[in-house]
Amino acid sequence: MGFITKAIPLALAAASVINGAEILETRAGVQTLADKYIVVMNDGISDKDFDSHRSWVNRNHRRRLIRRGAKAMGGMKHTYNFPTGLKGYSGHFDEQMINEISKRADVKYIERDARVQINAIEQQDNVPSWGLARVGSKEPGGTTYYYDSTAGEGSTAYVIDTGTDIQHEEFEGRATWGANFVDDMDMDCNGHGTHVSGTIGGKTFGVAKKSNVVAVKVLDCNGSGSNSGVIMGMEWATKDAQQKGADKAVANMSLGGAFSQASNDAAAAIAKGGVFLAVAAGNDNVDAADSSPASEPSICTIAASTEQDSKADFSNFGQVVDVYAPGDSITSAKPGGGSQVLSGISMATPHVAGLGAYLIGLGKGGGPGLCDTIKQMAIDVIQNPGASTTSKLINNGSGM
């Protein structure tokens, strides 16, 4: 079993429509959060109209609480306003309030909020990592990583995850804390995010050894959070990247789950904002077309390979996969110092985010177009990649 941060979001199956606004129904077995919802506004709604809508929601919510005298619902919690136009909010509402919201002409759709969590960790001690050598070589079995000395200098990687140990020696002061949307502890008390960050920008384990890393925490110490919190992290990363130069930014999301329109729309908003986004295809050995945000076509979707250049047995597959990257038995940083070995789609994805940062350092340009560049540079070597799936494995073009 591999390792991936897994979101369990909403399906589009049998969506109901009330006065034009879809209330997306949940698939059997989905772990939803009681009375919690994500509301997405119509495309093109103005800031003024969005403010007016939220004021209406807050007024009506307060009136309902006073009128019914029942246990309090929390009301509106998060507000989303991506610079590329996606607007919405999440909150704690009763069914009657949600039905009222769905009747508004300015609402596009509503999803139930859902749990985000990490699957079991596969760990093996004292095993050398092979992923870096494979990225820098056209042949398997190498032990040396060949790369240009620019090494991603000037690029910034946003790691949307469990946080990052920014004091770890691997980052040499290049890692900073960005934002936290899940708890009040600005630290990685799980280890997943630090491992991912090390693969992107660590001095020893990183594909882009001189890149900057920004921690965006959306999952807690148990590797758990919510879709609404993850979307908040995506919005924050997009805005911060645009302030600092989106063409120099990449983002990594080693998380995913069943199809969610809100998750896909948020991922598309990152790409539209000019940020290269690498996302895990999924860790369930199924077609990734039903996974989110992996199924969003404007981002770069990653599957996991083994040291033998075959599909990892846990990796998702399918037409939505853009490239393969090393994901089995990968060594990287762990919180508090030192390293650990983990396997999963979570480990493959940062190889691609790191390669994106590396190419930015080489002056290859940034943004979602980097995915096409990476696919063009990839080598056709993956054995048994899965039905309707690319056999391309990433390569940094070093010529070795």
UniProtKB/Swiss-Prot annotation:
Domain Inhibitor I9: 36-118
GO CC aspect terms: extracellular region
First-level EC class: hydrolase
Propeptide: 21-119
Record's keyword terms, sorted: Glycoprotein, Hydrolase, Protease, Secreted, Serine protease, Signal, Virulence, Zymogen
Key word Secreted present: yes
EC numbers: 3.4.21.-
Residues at the catalytic site: 161, 192, 346
Subcellular location: Secreted
Domain Peptidase S8: 129-400
Glycosylation (residues): 222, 252, 396
Keyword Ion transport: no
An example Gene Ontology biological process: proteolysis
A Gene Ontology molecular function term of the record: serine-type endopeptidase activity
Family in the record: Belongs to the peptidase S8 family.
Task of the protein: Secreted subtilisin-like serine protease with keratinolytic activity that contributes to pathogenicity.
Protein name as annotated: Subtilisin-like protease 7
Source organism per UniProt: Trichophyton soudanense
Lineage: Eukaryota, Fungi, Dikarya, Ascomycota, Pezizomycotina
UniProt gene name: SUB7
